[in-house]
From Swiss-Prot:
Glycans are attached at residues 85, 191, 366, 447, 471. A lipid is attached at residue 523 (S-palmitoyl cysteine). This is Fusion glycoprotein F0. It comes from Newcastle disease virus (strain Queensland/66) (NDV). GO terms for biological process: fusion of virus membrane with host plasma membrane; symbiont entry into host cell. It is a single-pass type I membrane protein; Single-pass membrane protein. The inactive precursor F0 is glycosylated and proteolytically cleaved into F1 and F2 to be functionally active. The cleavage is mediated by cellular proteases during the transport and maturation of the polypeptide. Residues 522-553 are cytoplasmic. Its main location: virion.
Amino acid sequence: MGSRSSTRIPVPLMLTVRVMLALSCVCPTSALDGRPLAAAGIVVTGDKAVNIYTSSQTGSIIIKLLPNMPKDKEACAKAPLEAYNRTLTTLLTPLGDSIRRIQESVTTSGGGKQGRLIGAIIGGVALGVATAAQITAASALIQANQNAANILLLKESIAATNEAVHEVTNGLSQLAVAVGKMQQFVNDQFNKTAQELDCIKITQQVGVELNLYLTELTTVFGPQITSPALTQLTIQALYNLAGGNMDYLLTKLGVGNNQLSSLISSGLITGNPILYDSQTQLLGIQVTLPSVGNLNNMRATYLETLSVSTTKGFASALVPKVVTQVGSVIEELDTSYCIETDLDLFFSRIVTFPMSPGIYSCLSGNTSACMYSKTEGALTTPYMTLKGSVIANCKMTTCRCADPPGIISQNYGEAVSLIDRQSCNMFSLDGITLRLSGEFDATYQKNISIQDSQVIVTGNLDISTELGNVNNSISNALDKLEESNSKLDKVNVKLTSTSALITYIVLTVISLVCGILSLVLACYLMYKQKAQQKTLLWLGNNTLDQMRATTKM
């Protein structure tokens, strides 16, 4: 296969803006129309928004791990809080030590700085091997060093507050939000209730909740046992640590509600621990999230193919899996550079490939330009549901209607059958019963036939078979050629020499000249003979007239 030319769009922020401005000049168009393609076995399964991103925004979240109890309930919760505090220190001290080692590696100036940095990273990695991702994480950790130091200056005030969420701004170079999942629990359970609780019940409630949170902490930091501080935390881990308070930071950083679910699903929001203070039980995490640009006039359209019936057997259409359309331009979209969610595609760069005129014409609705590859496998998908209806190849499988009862037949030469509630309310296919609620309106093309010229060979076995047929044809041609050669061998070569041919040509020319002269001479003699006949006839008539005149006298 030859290499394909591609359209590449990198994603520096300025270029992102330029791309969006350029595309905004294109008039919006509807998505790829799948109605004329469905009966040809090409099904448009859905569209997704196309976004480009670059990781550029950061913010800090300071997690208050140890809650402040109300004064009148401190004694009741003292025992579980002390046990919880000891467990926290044991669990997170390796993380804090790793962070300090990496951050202190930049204290040396000159050429020793890089060496100490790599040494600190290697020292925190099992087997002494640091990956590129770990080095990147360590570099980000060092860049956040000053911010972490400023947060530690405010640790006493952060630890003393009873607020579950509040902003920390003094001396910080980026947005920081202090949150406390356990503080939220204490506030909800004890500070905002007038109900009197006995000490045993308070101890039990606090102990159970702290144990649950410890379990979450262990789950979050379990992968960091071998390389503390160098493993990124996922958005799920951040939510486990901060609870619903995480939304406050994301909103402050500019993440809208319409994008939040897609960004969470994409995994583009990550966090790196930047500090841990065992005295106040504060855990600082730098959160990185992308700057996302939505290309409003560009969408990704997903295509699926069914095995259709042709006179050459079963075949599937040769079309891309994903295409994108901007204005009147349709190109294949490479999704290997993207992160996919239910509704969106997030690209670090956009790569498209131009399509051949035949495929372009096919996807534009000209089904006679579609090309198909033979697929005679028994497991090839012969049916697909679409908006409450079914597109099925009833030549490959038995299409049974339960309401009204009957077998749905497919006409000869018809590629697939479009089955909706107008033709069948309850549809049974391969043991699966479906109640149809959709309808194929008049805009859907039906009764499409695939011509023999549209079916080509692409599979290895089919190509081998075709090559065998070609070899047989070549063998037959060689036999005919050999027979012709044997006949030519019987020809007298002397008679076909150059001099003999020249002699034949000269004699032929002389014969033609003689023939022409003979013909001219014959014509002349005939003309002369006719003239003599006319003269004799005139003389005879004249003599007869004279004799008649003499007789009368």
